[in-house]
Amino acid sequence: MAKSKFERTKPHVNIGTIGHVDHGKTSLTAAITKYFGEFKAYDQIDAAPEERARGITISTAHVEYETEKRHYAHVDCPGHADYVKNMITGAAQMDGAILVVSAADGPMPQTREHILLARQVGVPAIVVFLNKVDQVDDAELLELVELEIRELLSKYDFPGDDIPIVKGSALAALEDKDKSIGEDAVRLLMSEVDNYIPTPERPIDQPFLLPIEDVFSISGRGTVVTGRVERGVIKVGEEIEIIGIRPTSKTTVTGVEMFRKLLDQGQAGDNIGALLRGVDREGIERGQVLAKPGSVTPHTRFKAEAYILTKDEGGRHTPFFTNYRPQFYFRTTDVTGIVTLPEGIEMVMPGDNVAMDVSLIVPIAMEEKLRFAIREGGRTVGAGIVSKIIE
């Protein structure tokens, strides 16, 4: 069968189901595909393939579907550890999340942890599906559970009072039972997702940024840097800043090449060579970035959320403590940093996820939500995301 062309007519949004184990994330995912996509049964989604992101193996199921308004790519993970890894590494980017909570149990430890992670990694918006409502006869009890969910969301700085909560039963939807809590609830959920989760700004519309991968000089022409444009557009003749590792400097892009052809501009996703005016080959290096002036700044100290690999995943065999000094791999280069653990946390074991403060020995062009790998001698031992810049 011929592969159908990916229709680019609708806005595209990346989404995922989050929540406590056995609250119905995978059943809900299956139910959504039943009405909005090519139906995928529970077992097809649950048998998620393994993939590698930043040196870490993660099991993630990807499904796609569309509403009248949008096209969605949806991720669902089989295990709690996979969620933690997925959210921290950004293996599957999430523009929004559907938090699934069982009405019979209410919020549980992983409900809390996934909300906290969503906050730390910058998931912009959450919509709630209160599942298994057919297991609760008492309307007052349902109200209490809803209140509890709203309070929990507010506690982690989501607008708990405004977040849509849809009540239903994923199982009823899958089994074509009680339509009001089955099919109708799933359709209502997707209309809330359509309206409440904002359409992300496309990379091409964001300010220009290119992480430098390589630098060389061309006799008679000057210095060329190569790399993949991460976001935005660069036109010949535009002024840019060179940021990170050394003091920030300004230059002008005098040429853009792709596949040995000269272009007027390079844009998000393009692998380009950029010719820079008046820059010495020695004055620029891999690990710096080219960026639109004023759009991003260099920093050395930040708070991060990180996942530390287990021994079986190829990570450390032993715990680490405050003053641990690994390399932090940002975009294209390793920078040594010193770790400070939060008060009350003595050590971090392989397999833990942890909040920590990091102080780099040289500044890197940085913003919140920037992801990194933690490495020791070129071997990945963890992954993290900048949750807050300190200085």
Swiss-Prot record:
<dbReference type="GO" id="GO:0003924">
    <property type="term" value="F:GTPase activity"/>
</dbReference>
<keyword id="KW-0547">Nucleotide-binding</keyword>
<dbReference type="InterPro" id="IPR005225">
    <property type="entry name" value="Small_GTP-bd"/>
</dbReference>
<dbReference type="Pfam" id="PF00009">
    <property type="entry name" value="GTP_EFTU"/>
</dbReference>
<dbReference type="InterPro" id="IPR004160">
    <property type="entry name" value="Transl_elong_EFTu/EF1A_C"/>
</dbReference>
<dbReference type="InterPro" id="IPR009001">
    <property type="entry name" value="Transl_elong_EF1A/Init_IF2_C"/>
</dbReference>
<dbReference type="GO" id="GO:0005525">
    <property type="term" value="F:GTP binding"/>
</dbReference>
<feature type="binding site">
    <location>
        <begin position="19"/>
        <end position="26"/>
    </location>
    <ligand>
        <name>GTP</name>
    </ligand>
</feature>
<feature type="binding site">
    <location>
        <position position="26"/>
    </location>
    <ligand>
        <name>Mg(2+)</name>
    </ligand>
</feature>
<comment type="subunit">
    <text>Monomer.</text>
</comment>
<dbReference type="Pfam" id="PF03143">
    <property type="entry name" value="GTP_EFTU_D3"/>
</dbReference>
<keyword id="KW-0963">Cytoplasm</keyword>
<dbReference type="InterPro" id="IPR027417">
    <property type="entry name" value="P-loop_NTPase"/>
</dbReference>
<dbReference type="GO" id="GO:0003746">
    <property type="term" value="F:translation elongation factor activity"/>
</dbReference>
<dbReference type="InterPro" id="IPR033720">
    <property type="entry name" value="EFTU_2"/>
</dbReference>
<keyword id="KW-0479">Metal-binding</keyword>
<comment type="similarity">
    <text>Belongs to the TRAFAC class translation factor GTPase superfamily. Classic translation factor GTPase family. EF-Tu/EF-1A subfamily.</text>
</comment>
<feature type="region of interest" description="G3">
    <location>
        <begin position="76"/>
        <end position="79"/>
    </location>
</feature>
<comment type="function">
    <text>GTP hydrolase that promotes the GTP-dependent binding of aminoacyl-tRNA to the A-site of ribosomes during protein biosynthesis.</text>
</comment>
<keyword id="KW-0378">Hydrolase</keyword>
<dbReference type="InterPro" id="IPR009000">
    <property type="entry name" value="Transl_B-barrel_sf"/>
</dbReference>
<dbReference type="InterPro" id="IPR031157">
    <property type="entry name" value="G_TR_CS"/>
</dbReference>
<dbReference type="InterPro" id="IPR004541">
    <property type="entry name" value="Transl_elong_EFTu/EF1A_bac/org"/>
</dbReference>
<protein>
    <recommendedName>
        <fullName>Elongation factor Tu 2</fullName>
        <ecNumber>3.6.5.3</ecNumber>
    </recommendedName>
</protein>
<keyword id="KW-0648">Protein biosynthesis</keyword>
<dbReference type="GO" id="GO:0097216">
    <property type="term" value="F:guanosine tetraphosphate binding"/>
</dbReference>
<feature type="region of interest" description="G4">
    <location>
        <begin position="131"/>
        <end position="134"/>
    </location>
</feature>
<dbReference type="InterPro" id="IPR050055">
    <property type="entry name" value="EF-Tu_GTPase"/>
</dbReference>
<feature type="binding site">
    <location>
        <begin position="76"/>
        <end position="80"/>
    </location>
    <ligand>
        <name>GTP</name>
    </ligand>
</feature>
<dbReference type="InterPro" id="IPR041709">
    <property type="entry name" value="EF-Tu_GTP-bd"/>
</dbReference>
<dbReference type="InterPro" id="IPR000795">
    <property type="entry name" value="T_Tr_GTP-bd_dom"/>
</dbReference>
<keyword id="KW-0251">Elongation factor</keyword>
<dbReference type="InterPro" id="IPR004161">
    <property type="entry name" value="EFTu-like_2"/>
</dbReference>
<feature type="binding site">
    <location>
        <begin position="131"/>
        <end position="134"/>
    </location>
    <ligand>
        <name>GTP</name>
    </ligand>
</feature>
<dbReference type="GO" id="GO:0005829">
    <property type="term" value="C:cytosol"/>
</dbReference>
<feature type="region of interest" description="G2">
    <location>
        <begin position="55"/>
        <end position="59"/>
    </location>
</feature>
<keyword id="KW-0342">GTP-binding</keyword>
<dbReference type="Pfam" id="PF03144">
    <property type="entry name" value="GTP_EFTU_D2"/>
</dbReference>
<keyword id="KW-0460">Magnesium</keyword>
<feature type="region of interest" description="G1">
    <location>
        <begin position="19"/>
        <end position="26"/>
    </location>
</feature>
<feature type="domain" description="tr-type G">
    <location>
        <begin position="10"/>
        <end position="201"/>
    </location>
</feature>
<feature type="region of interest" description="G5">
    <location>
        <begin position="169"/>
        <end position="171"/>
    </location>
</feature>
